[in-house]
Design a protein with these regions (language model features):
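Short acidic-hydrophobic surface loop/beta-edge motif
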Residues: 12-14, 72
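Conserved Nudix-box catalytic region and its N-terminal flanking loop in Nudix hydrolases
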Residues: 15-57
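A generic structural signal for short beta-strands and their flanking turns/coil linkers
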Residues: 8-10, 30-32, 64, 80-82
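Unchanged
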Residues: 41-126, 133-141
Length: 141
């Protein structure tokens, strides 16, 4: 028997005070578009470890306090997107090789036409409409 299982994407929606950290993709799909630090889980890591690793690789941030916030299923491409929120202790960022640029955006300056994926748009909308985030907010598409 050969199983084809969906891929799991872990990510972090990092925020500092009332600004959200977005990164501009330097890879396809979505080259030049804005997203949040996220990527495919690797073997032998937990979802939290994968999300933290992606945040470190893409924007050089430490995310110590992760709160599961969104589960977004994408059946047409067999992916499940799982996103944590993380309030950052500082606004220091270091752009990694998969990122063209990174910046903190206030809610009214998010570049909506240039957001990369529907899962990211869904997550940003849920974050903004429920800010400030408490421990019991959780959303599924």
């Amino acid at each position: 028997i050969h199983y084809e299982n969906p891929k799991v994407i872990g990510g972090v929606l990092p925020f500092y005070h009332d600004k959200i950290l977005l990164c501009q993709r330097s890879i396809e799909p979505g080259y030049g578009l804005w997203t949040i630090p996220s990527g495919f889980m690797e073997c032998n890591e937990t979802l939290q470890e994968g999300a933290k690793r992606e945040a470190q690789e893409e924007v050089g941030i430490q995310c110590d306090n992760l709160q599961l916030f969104v589960v977004y299923s994408i059946p047409r491409i067999s992916q499940v997107y799982m996103l944590f929120c993380s309030e950052l202790a500082s606004n220091n960022i270091v752009v990694g090789p998969e990122t063209l640029a990174a910046d903190f955006f206030s809610f009214n300056t998010i570049p909506w036409p240039d957001i990369a994926f529907s899962a990211v748009k869904f997550s940003l909308n849920k974050f903004i409409s429920n800010y400030p985030i408490t421990n019991n907010e959780f959303f599924i598409n």
